[in-house]
């Protein structure tokens, strides 16, 4: 079915979810680094997905992105720093965490993550990364990452599964 052929009365929540979110499923592969994109709610929604993958042995490195300063209950921190503190509390080893504290938006999250990956792990030694963000943010984030990352690095989506009807209704 072509999207251009869909009539308004044919739209269902399930069809909208399928159109927006198909082909962004996690493959379950092991990777060289897990990249978590920043947001004010990244610690609540995105970080647990990354930590689950880390504890499952899919990677021993996590890059936390987000330089935007936010007011959290414990004080004002960058998004990445707030995730860092939570990651330590959830059993991630300090030496397995990298912070990208400069970015202010999705494009910068990915650009500056590349810089940090080069500085810490060397891009030529990286073959696969796991990109963690919310489901509704994944298609755009994945397109940006696949455009900006070197061709030899496979970017695997790992969406935090919130479907559009859950975001609207719940």
Task: Explain the meaning of each model-derived region.
Residues 1-170:
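A structural signal for short, hydrophobic/glycine-enriched beta-strand patches
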